[in-house]
């Protein structure tokens, strides 16, 4: 059954909700921000832990976020996942407090070429059950979903399809997919992508798939549950009341999870 998954997005040391497609690596560029929290990251870590919202992730969007990430992880040790700048030199350090590490850009060269050997290396160090592979993507004009890196600004040579999941499941049992084109817009999920995620992974019972991007109603949990036959979990961000949104109540999402058991 589809579950609600929480997030803690960090930007310059603060908990924020950002429109995904507006993030860049340029210092002079300011991303479009939906919300800046007055609470520290540990506040949200405690909130998720107290309500037993399993599988939540802390994402470091750029530099100056390590302290805030540690604060969240140490508030709820071994409960939250962490991503952003994860590689083979720091993964074990983060796993002192995190349940899993989320890896993205490090799996690619600067030009966007996928490096399977890097994922193999990470699996050797951490174990496949402590790694989440982030396959966040953008949709191309010809209807394909291509994995995007560098704050979702650079398209890579890795396409989301059945072959990709078949190969990468050897090294991890969880994937996180942000639909970058709709992330932070509260304009609705990418229904076709959610359906495809089920189609591509339906034969792998042990594989966990988490989708993020565009969720705007608690009813989206039911929608994702139907589209993915319960295979895909759903992350809410900017639409949630705990992040300044007025479309979705955190309490309602928690009740959904409790009903699912």
From Swiss-Prot:
It catalyses: 1-(5-phospho-beta-D-ribosyl)-5-[(5-phospho-beta-D-ribosylamino)methylideneamino]imidazole-4-carboxamide = 5-[(5-phospho-1-deoxy-D-ribulos-1-ylimino)methylamino]-1-(5-phospho-beta-D-ribosyl)imidazole-4-carboxamide. It is found in: Cytoplasm. It comes from the Eukaryota. One of its GO terms (biological process) is L-histidine biosynthetic process. InterPro entries: Aldolase_TIM, His6-like_euk, His_biosynth, Isoase_HisA-like, RibuloseP-bd_barrel. Keywords: Amino-acid biosynthesis, Cytoplasm, Histidine biosynthesis, Isomerase. One of its GO terms (molecular function) is 1-(5-phosphoribosyl)-5-[(5-phosphoribosylamino)methylideneamino]imidazole-4-carboxamide isomerase activity. Pathway: Amino-acid biosynthesis; L-histidine biosynthesis; L-histidine from 5-phospho-alpha-D-ribose 1-diphosphate: step 4/9. Its EC number is 5.3.1.16. Present with 6490 molecules/cell in log phase SD medium. Catalyzes the isomerization of the aminoaldose moiety of ProFAR to the aminoketose of PRFAR. This is 1-(5-phosphoribosyl)-5-[(5-phosphoribosylamino)methylideneamino] imidazole-4-carboxamide isomerase. The gene is HIS6.
């Amino acid at each position: 059954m589809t579950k609600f998954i929480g997030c803690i997005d960090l930007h310059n040391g603060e908990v924020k909700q950002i429109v995904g497609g507006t993030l860049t690596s340029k210092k002079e560029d300011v991303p479009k921000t939906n919300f800046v929290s007055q609470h520290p990251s540990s506040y949200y870590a405690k909130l998720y832990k107290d309500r037993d919202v399993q599988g939540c992730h802390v994402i470091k969007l750029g530099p100056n976020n390590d302290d805030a990430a540690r604060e969240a992880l140490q508030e709820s040790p071994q409960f939250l996942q962490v991503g952003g700048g994860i590689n083979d030199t720091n993964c074990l350090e983060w796993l002192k407090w995190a349940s899993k590490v989320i890896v993205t850009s490090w799996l690619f060269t600067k030009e966007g070429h996928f490096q399977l050997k890097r994922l193999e290396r990470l699996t050797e160090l951490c174990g496949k059950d402590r790694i989440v592979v982030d396959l966040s993507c953008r949709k191309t004009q010809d209807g394909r979903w291509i994995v995007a890196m560098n704050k979702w600004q650079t398209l890579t040579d890795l396409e989301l399809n059945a072959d990709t999941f078949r190969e990468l499941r050897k090294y991890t049992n969880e994937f996180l997919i942000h639909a970058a084109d709709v992330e932070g817009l509260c304009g609705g999920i990418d229904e076709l992508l959610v359906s495809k995620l089920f189609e591509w992974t339906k034969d792998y019972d042990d594989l966990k798939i988490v989708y993020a991007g565009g969720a705007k109603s608690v009813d989206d949990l039911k929608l994702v549950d139907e589209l993915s036959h319960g295979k895909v979990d759903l992350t809410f961000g900017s639409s949630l009341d705990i992040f300044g949104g007025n479309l979705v109540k955190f309490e309602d999402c928690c009740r959904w999870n409790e009903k699912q058991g």
